[in-house]
């Protein structure tokens, strides 16, 4: 079988010390590895120098906003419960949500949280997932009211590889400066490096566009099939404004900030759908056909994200750059350093 289709071909070893548990401060001082595909040149710099390397291009950001999706409560028996909200079921008649719950629970069980919030377990699904309904003062909560309540009692859902509890600083650090549309349970992390000053300087030379893709918990789901083509990609809600669609439809060069932007642009390019659910899986055998440049962080081994990067530059080249980044002590994952692919 083609090695590009083998899960084991996307593996690498990373020392725990290179997993960033906190962002660089100030954030634009994070390191940046620049790879020029045309000339096969590599540059090591800092993120604040990003503009020095950018060609003439439109820049696309994901303006999704992370909700405080993790809450702690109790069962009627007093046993402790941790609930991680994934997403609403948008087509259900009653407001129902998909959630992951730690602890043994039964169908129709009621769980209790702060602010008189109650959760009824409607259905037990696979992989620890549950279909649930939220109540406050015996009234069913819709998405908007639930998100408002979670803002009071919830916790920022840090990724599983950050081995600490969320802190006050994460409220700001794990949210991009242009985040506005609530619905993500993970941050589009390439966006986290940008400061207001950097963004203002970018606007002087580049047109900036926003789209929304609500990053789901599926972004952390590991690929388990040795033939990656058998992997079932998670689905995430997206919306692209008309003005952004017109740029995608043009011949203007595009820099996508983050893998979520890339998947949204490429899904639209293939389907001409401006609003819906994206389940596009990009890898070397299904490469991008529209986006020209990519800004992204360093991703987990065997993840769909490292496969997406490989779709841009080839699997072997991707692994070589990761090997170099490890040698040069770059910081990895959500709070880590960045890579610019030209």
From Swiss-Prot:
GO terms for molecular function: S-adenosylmethionine:tRNA ribosyltransferase-isomerase activity. It comes from the Bacteria. Pfam families: Queuosine_synth (PF02547). Pathway: tRNA modification; tRNA-queuosine biosynthesis. It catalyses: 7-aminomethyl-7-carbaguanosine(34) in tRNA + S-adenosyl-L-methionine = epoxyqueuosine(34) in tRNA + adenine + L-methionine + 2 H(+). It is found in: Cytoplasm. One of its GO terms (biological process) is tRNA wobble guanine modification. It is an enzyme of class 2 (transferase). Keywords: Cytoplasm, Queuosine biosynthesis, S-adenosyl-L-methionine, Transferase. Its EC number is 2.4.99.17. One of its GO terms (cellular component) is cytoplasm. Belongs to the QueA family. Transfers and isomerizes the ribose moiety from AdoMet to the 7-aminomethyl group of 7-deazaguanine (preQ1-tRNA) to give epoxyqueuosine (oQ-tRNA). Monomer. This is S-adenosylmethionine:tRNA ribosyltransferase-isomerase. It comes from Campylobacter jejuni subsp. jejuni serotype O:2 (strain ATCC 700819 / NCTC 11168).
